[in-house]
């Protein structure tokens, strides 16, 4: 999927600029 820069438990929303639409 996307880089491991996501907040697990936040609807798979990127907290960084890695994979952010």
UniProtKB/Swiss-Prot annotation:
Positions of the UniProt region annotated as Disordered: 1-21
Record key words, sorted: Adaptive immunity, Blood coagulation, Coiled coil, Disulfide bond, Glycoprotein, Hemostasis, Immunity, Innate immunity, Pyrrolidone carboxylic acid, Secreted, Sulfation
Modification Sulfotyrosine occurs at: 6
Localization: Secreted
Comp. bias intervals (Acidic residues): 1-11
Residues annotated as glycosylated: 4
A GO CC term assigned to this protein in UniProt: extracellular region
Domain notes from UniProt: A long coiled coil structure formed by 3 polypeptide chains connects the central nodule to the C-terminal domains (distal nodules). The long C-terminal ends of the alpha chains fold back, contributing a fourth strand to the coiled coil structure.
Role according to the record: Cleaved by the protease thrombin to yield monomers which, together with fibrinogen alpha (FGA) and fibrinogen gamma (FGG), polymerize to form an insoluble fibrin matrix. Fibrin has a major function in hemostasis as one of the primary components of blood clots. In addition, functions during the early stages of wound repair to stabilize the lesion and guide cell migration during re-epithelialization. Was originally thought to be essential for platelet aggregation, based on in vitro studies using anticoagulated blood.
Designated name of the protein: Fibrinogen beta chain
Organism: Syncerus caffer (African buffalo)
């Amino acid at each position: 999927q996307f880089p491991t820069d996501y907040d697990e438990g936040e609807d798979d929303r990127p907290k960084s600029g890695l994979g952010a639409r």
